[in-house]
């Protein structure tokens, strides 16, 4: 496992990664805001081909755009991040796909959401994002394209673009390569 933009304070024990998210961190490219940010934190491993990332995320997000979840990243211009993002005073399910420029989709979550389970799966050029809250069955949040031939840094992501930072924990982080499907 390796860090992209290692935070000042973090610890991993047993099956929990605890991060104090540094302020002024984010991943974004141009769309709607005009700026480029590539300073968020990612803890994961580089994999090629088909893969799965699964994790439960608990956070105390409270400032606009506080975020934590999963990232698949080929480079600074090609990536996907998904998870909880605090937006307009509420936790939201957020997915950003960046292929040169960022595209952002958000949807509502219960106002008291402090934990979410995520599963992100890449098969060929398709990435499927699923989420669940509590004991609910996983729901499909997004199906997006990422170039199939790219190696990806796959793992836990967090950022605090506007606030003072926050604390987040990642539980049962699982990152696995999958053999290609036989046709």
Task: Please describe what each predicted stretch is.
Residues 1-183:
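Extracellular glycan-recognition regions
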